[in-house]
Amino acid sequence: KCNFRPQFSKPVLPNISSEKEGSADEILKKNSLDGLKEKFLKVFKIEEKYLKTNDQYLKYKDRLDHELKIIIEMKYPSYFLIVSDYIKWAKNNDIPVGPGRGSGAGSLVAWCLSITDVDPIKFNLIFERFLNPDRVSMPDFDIDFCEEKRDLVFKYLTTKYKDSVAHII
């Protein structure tokens, strides 16, 4: 008679921290804030010197801080950084990437990191549908790559993250 009960634990993600850039939490905060500033400069055409007094920017910054707090508390900064990394790599290597769909499109952090191309505040999307402290499962971005070139993305991931990569077909 077998009496095996599997033990489930939190996913183990590669360590994204570095001496130069700091912890994954610090890198996520910096990259997200840099991304938000870039969106306001390019999308909203607001000069950087006016950001700290712009009501719209302050609204976005409050939402960003709220999301970052939850992501960090739930220990998912590395996940967001890894997804951002391979999506930016794909875009820089002429691999078409979908704009973002599913509940992940509700994340302002994802938009700031270029994971999605959807401004969740503009479309009244709710972050907590994607990630909240009551959720037991790991968040999951629905990402679409060009079918002809998606193997290149997997090759990039396995080259960079080695044994930390798994792929379900």
Residue ranges and their predicted role:
Residues 1-169:
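Phosphodiester-processing cores and adjacent nucleic acid-binding clamps
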